[in-house]
From Swiss-Prot:
Annotated keywords: Amino-acid biosynthesis, Cytoplasm, Histidine biosynthesis, Lyase
Family: Belongs to the imidazoleglycerol-phosphate dehydratase family.
Protein name: Imidazoleglycerol-phosphate dehydratase
Matching InterPro entries: IGPD_sf, ImidazoleglycerolP_deHydtase, ImidazoleglycerP_deHydtase_CS, Ribosomal_Su5_D2-typ_SF
Gene: hisB
Amino acid sequence: MREATVERATAETWVWLRLGLDGPTGGKVDTGLPFLDHMLLQLQRHGRFLLEVEARGDLEVDVHHLVEDVGIALGMALKEALGDGVGLERYAEAFAPMDETLVLCVLDLSGRPHLEFRPEAWPVVGEAGGVNHYHLREFLRGLVNHGRLTLHLRLLSGREAHHVVEASFKALARALHKATRRTGEGVPSTKGVL
């Protein structure tokens, strides 16, 4: 079973995270930030992953450090759980609607970190539970850099912050589920490695 557990501690945060790509799903999520917990549960449910997270951070300063470091820990666990990439689907895309909002996520488990996401171009109003689409960028940046994947996230319609962030997590979850499936033999690259 492809699974990884990571622990990350800094002067600002502490994160313990367990990710399982196959087998049982679910798991307890408690970051001390209820909206982030809600988003991680979307990732767990719609990605059909085992995802357990326990985290604490300097929320009295800002949510930025905690959101970013949970993304970093998730990226580290994803990279470890994927191993050498043998048999991976590798590429995937997913749309996620939520009322007026529509988000597209396209990713490649390439071993090359790149994030294509411009929240300043998103006409989003407000934030949800202390989290906004700029915090989403920091989460994704941590995931991409430490998971070593290429990720494109596009807002096709929507303005309400809660819907935009939640649809983004759902699209990411669905794309990650597809890309992490084992559907072939060998490494899906002409280079022979990811």
